[in-house]
């Protein structure tokens, strides 16, 4: 029975918990958008200068 009370009490504080969870979700979405933007930029560079990109990568010791 005491576990039920704890669960009910914890469920009553849902509004406070949704704040940080919502903020975390927004941060994940923003980071996802940033990653997508970086990947799009890399794709653009590779489409325009793939040969130059490979040469520069090899010259810098890329494997």
Swiss-Prot record:
Name its species. Saccharopolyspora erythraea (strain ATCC 11635 / DSM 40517 / JCM 4748 / NBRC 13426 / NCIMB 8594 / NRRL 2338)
Q: Which InterPro entries match?
A: Ubiquitin-like_Pup
Protein name in UniProt: Prokaryotic ubiquitin-like protein Pup 1
Q: Where is this cross-link: Isoglutamyl lysine isopeptide (Gln-Lys) (interchain with K-? in acceptor proteins)?
A: 63
Member of which family? Belongs to the prokaryotic ubiquitin-like protein family.
> Which Pfam families does this UniProt record tie to the protein?
Pup
Q: Where is this region: ARC ATPase binding?
A: 20-57
Comment, domains:
The N-terminal unstructured half of Pup provides a signal required to initiate unfolding and degradation by the proteasome but is not needed for pupylation, while the C-terminal helical half of Pup interacts with ARC to target proteins to the proteasome.
Keywords recorded for this protein, A-Z:
Coiled coil, Isopeptide bond, Ubl conjugation pathway
Give the modified residues of type Deamidated glutamine. 63
Record note on quaternary structure: Strongly interacts with the proteasome-associated ATPase ARC through a hydrophobic interface; the interacting region of Pup lies in its C-terminal half. There is one Pup binding site per ARC hexamer ring.
Q: What kind of modification does the protein receive after translation?
A: Is modified by deamidation of its C-terminal glutamine to glutamate by the deamidase Dop, a prerequisite to the subsequent pupylation process.
Compositional bias (Basic and acidic residues): 1-12, 24-33
Q: Which GO terms describe its molecular function?
A: proteasome binding; protein tag activity
GO biological process, alphabetically ordered: modification-dependent protein catabolic process; proteasomal protein catabolic process; protein pupylation
Task: List the residue ranges of the region (Disordered).
Answer: 1-35
Its gene is: pup1
**Quick one: signal sequence residues?**
none
The answer, when asked if Coiled coil is one of the entry's keywords, is yes
User: What the protein does?
Assistant: Protein modifier that is covalently attached to lysine residues of substrate proteins, thereby targeting them for proteasomal degradation. The tagging system is termed pupylation.
Look up the record and name the pathway of this protein.
Protein degradation; proteasomal Pup-dependent pathway
Residue stretches in coiled coil = 25-51
């Amino acid at each position: 029975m005491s576990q039920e009370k704890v669960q009910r009490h914890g469920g009553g504080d849902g509004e406070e918990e949704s704040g940080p969870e919502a903020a975390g979700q927004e941060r994940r979405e923003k980071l996802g958008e940033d990653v997508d933007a970086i990947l799009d930029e890399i794709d653009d560079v590779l489409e325009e200068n793939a040969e130059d990109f490979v040469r520069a990568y090899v010259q810098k010791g890329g494997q």
